[in-house]
Amino acid sequence: MSVKEQVIAILKEVKPTKNLENEKDIIENGLLDSFELMTLIANLCDTFGIEIDVDKMTPENFNSAEAITAMIESLK
């Protein structure tokens, strides 16, 4: 499974009632609440064995599956 496929699976797990796969403004449109965002970050860290520093926790890095994937790949 590719990084992007894993990211999409995690997004579906965190927010099963909403298809976020093709969404471009997840954060800016308020599609995840604060608890869901923290759950997403924890799941990403666990799945990919990475640490996401506070300076990486910006809307730009979490607005889409593509942005999340790019951030993860930059941290590996």
Feature-to-residue mapping (PLM):
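C-terminal structural segments of small proteins and small subunits
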Residues: 53-74
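Thiotemplate assembly-line natural product biosynthesis machinery
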Residues: 1-19, 70-75
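Conserved catalytic core of two-component sensor histidine kinases
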Residues: 38
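Catalytic nucleophile serine of serine hydrolases
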Residues: 34
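Phosphopantetheine carrier-protein modules
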Residues: 12-31, 48-56
